[in-house]
Amino acid sequence: MHPAHLLVLLAVCVSLLGASDIPPLPLNLAQFGFMIRCANGGSRSPLDYTDYGCYCGKGGRGTPVDDLDRCCQVHDECYGEAEKRLGCSPFVTLYSWKCYGKAPSCNTKTDCQRFVCNCDAKAAECFARSPYQKKNWNINTKARCK
């Protein structure tokens, strides 16, 4: 092997060893997004929910601003239960599901997959039945979420 190739290979191996401390990406967010589209019939993008109220998106605290934000609070709590009761990692748990009309249906094998899929399905259905109020998107969470 050419010395330059060996040096590159060594650099890649060292980089990969260092990358083992990097937390995994939230792989199931894409699945959750498709589930949201299933439940709402594609009427609203899943991205519309990322910075909504006090709970939709990263983190969450305070009192939910409306029913839709409450859906996100319940979803956060459901993920917390998956971690606490079953030792699941909800953000990286992939599962199998199908869309029947506007109803997501979980079809999974393990307890973690089933629990996380049900968290997502219930949240997606809750999003679909709760009004979206633009005034609650991208709010000042420091001021409103106490």
Curated annotation (Swiss-Prot):
Example of a GO cellular component annotation carried by this entry: extracellular region
Enzyme Commission code: 3.1.1.4
GO biological process per UniProt: arachidonate secretion; lipid catabolic process; phospholipid metabolic process
The keyword Hydrolase is annotated on this UniProt entry: yes
The UniProt record lists the keyword Secreted: yes
Cofactor: Ca(2+)
One Pfam family hit: Phospholip_A2_1
UniProt note on tissues of expression: Expressed by the venom gland.
InterPro entries assigned to the protein according to its UniProt record, in alphabetical order: PLipase_A2 (IPR001211), PLipase_A2_Asp_AS (IPR033112), PLipase_A2_dom (IPR016090), PLipase_A2_dom_sf (IPR036444), PLipase_A2_His_AS (IPR033113)
Record annotation: effect of changing residue 76 to K: Complete loss of neurotoxicity and catalytic activity, no change in binding affinity to M-type receptors, 1230-fold decrease in binding affinity to N-type receptors
Disulfide bonds: 38-99, 54-145, 56-72, 71-126, 78-119, 88-112, 106-117
Keyword annotations: Calcium, Disulfide bond, Hydrolase, Lipid degradation, Lipid metabolism, Metal-binding, Myotoxin, Neurotoxin, Presynaptic neurotoxin, Secreted, Signal, Toxin
Localization annotation: Secreted
Subcellular location, principal: secreted
GO molecular function: calcium ion binding; calcium-dependent phospholipase A2 activity; phospholipid binding; toxin activity
Alphabetical list of CDD domains matching this protein: PLA2c
Physiological role: Snake venom phospholipase A2 (PLA2) that shows high presynaptic neurotoxicity in vertebrata that is independent of catalytic activity, as well as local myotoxicity when intramuscularly injected into mice. Blocks acetylcholine release in Aplysia neurons, and potentiates pro-inflammatory cellular signaling. Potentiates glutamate excitoxicity when coinjected into brain of rats. May act by binding in a calcium-dependent fashion and with high affinity to a neuronal-type (N-type) PLA2 receptor, and with very high affinity to a muscle-type (M-type) PLA2 receptor.
Protein name: Phospholipase A2 OS2
Organism: Oxyuranus scutellatus scutellatus
Lineage: Eukaryota, Metazoa, Chordata, Craniata, Vertebrata
